[in-house]
Amino acid sequence: MHLSSCKKTYNIETQRAVPLEETLARIEPKIPAAGITRVAEITGLDRIGIPVFSCIRPTAEDGAITVYNGKGATVEESRISGIMEGIERYSSEIHDRKVRLDTFEMIEGREPAVNPKDLILPEDTESGHVLPWVEGWDIANDKPVLVPAQAVFHPLPRNFRQIFRTSTNGLASGNTREEAIFHALCEVIERDAWSLVEACRDTGPAVTGIDDPMLAEMQKK
């Protein structure tokens, strides 16, 4: 996998590689393929006034939710957020992708692979189990690496061995591969910080002095 420089050319209410209208034009034709049947504005359901959209995807696989929300500073940004959330969830399902069944012990030393024990498993988890694996890319070392499918897909079908709960942690989309990876990494960093706050009961200093006009206006709401 080759990653290239990806400049942010749109910097109004968000930072993206292309303008919002171009993103919307790209994704709307893909709505049916992702199983999305309805995209509706639900801003009026509360009194805040920040644009919010709901995306309905009734064909989600067993174990996944079927309703997703998108938010943004503008109606257009919020609509894109909702649709992309639905596309992300569709993309996170296994569908017809092939997986490799093997134990980590059989792979270790022969091919680069993520050790399941590095994924914060429950203390009583035993090793030596046959697990489903898929190929990922180690962006730090620029080479392919096998990853437990449970850390990639959500949900993972029940016929595969479950060593931990699947989730959407680190799931992100973008106008380019680089943009999607950037936002996925940001989400993982955010969740890590969130976990530390919950564990330490320390939220840190309050954020004050917001001088961006759009953020200040949203804060007032």
PLM features: residue spans?
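Helix-coil modules at protein/domain termini and other flexible surface or pore-lining loops
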Residues: M1-K221
